[in-house]
Amino acid sequence: MPLHNLTRFPRLEFIGAPTPLEYLPRFSDYLGREIFIKRDDVTPMAMGGNKLRKLEFLAADALREGADTLITAGAIQSNHVRQTAAVAAKLGLHCVALLENPIGTTAENYLTNGNRLLLNLFNTQIEMCDALTDPNAQLEELATRVEAQGFRPYVIPVGGSNALGALGYVESALEIAQQCEGAVNISSVVVASGSAGTHAGLAVGLEHLMPESELIGVTVSRSVADQLPKVVNLQQAIAKELELTASAEILLWDDYFAPGYGVPNDEGMEAVKLLARLEGILLDPVYTGKAMAGLIDGISQKRFKDEGPILFIHTGGAPALFAYHPHV
């Protein structure tokens, strides 16, 4: 892949060194398959997570445009909103977050703990809405109101998932390929697929760098029919930005997110407990727990293309564990 195509985009350096790519010996023994994990849960800011890779590009663009305010949206327990607020604090910017309660709970822990608690620490301005039914339009309307108050807002989409933000996961694919080179031939890569930027960025990068590896997105909020166009559209938009072709098939599994986004399920919580007990690594109930449930079931159901090593992309999210107590 021509690296110069990535380097022409302004980017802030938040992460520094590559995040670890580790072998999981006890988990591998338990599953009877070599399992590796990419530790994007340990990126440096605000208790870690994958969105920081996207924010390196998005925040750089905001500064280039002269913005003094970052505006974004998500669930009350959004990891993306938490990381955006932290970046705003680090850069001396105002942050306005449009939040919804997707599970309709009145549980105090969900409404005040976990990521929501951290938003207060980052001095985030919170705006609540009934539902993010049309988040792009709702964010633009909020930006207009904020601008009328004298601020210079920059809108970051839900999950940081546009073509610019997703470049962070093309960059991640480069990192993964370099870490695997001469060390391990990964057969399959598993990632949670939600707002689709992480999945689409990896799809573009891995197609060119590790073409023999299949990439599987485990959906956390939508059926394959609803999620596929989101990932494909972003995949093509990223490729256009980089002047590359992107023809890799997008593979999605939608068997593991029921009963819905943000609602824990038994398989996901078992996966959270299993990795904690075997490896001391924390997953979360919303994204990585469900994605790991897909990996575990995928092995038992022989859904992977072969029996080679599997890489799990750990996108973070552990702060939500505290909000979902006592489900945990």
UniProtKB/Swiss-Prot annotation:
Gene3D superfamilies linked: 3.40.50.1100
Record function comment: Catalyzes the alpha,beta-elimination reaction of D-cysteine and of several D-cysteine derivatives. It could be a defense mechanism against D-cysteine.
Designated name of the protein: D-cysteine desulfhydrase
Organism expressing this protein natively: Shigella boydii serotype 18 (strain CDC 3083-94 / BS512)
SUPFAM superfamilies, per the entry: Tryptophan synthase beta subunit-like PLP-dependent enzymes
Protein's UniProt keywords contain rRNA processing: no
Quaternary structure and partners: Homodimer.
Reactions catalysed: D-cysteine + H2O = hydrogen sulfide + pyruvate + NH4(+) + H(+)
Modified residues (N6-(pyridoxal phosphate)lysine): K51
Molecular functions per Gene Ontology: D-cysteine desulfhydrase activity
Gene Ontology biological process terms, A to Z: D-amino acid metabolic process
Family: Belongs to the ACC deaminase/D-cysteine desulfhydrase family.
The entry's keywords: Lyase, Pyridoxal phosphate
EC number: 4.4.1.15
UniProt cofactor(s): pyridoxal 5'-phosphate
Matches recorded under PANTHER family: 1-AMINOCYCLOPROPANE-1-CARBOXYLATE DEAMINASE-RELATED
Domain of life of the native organism: Bacteria
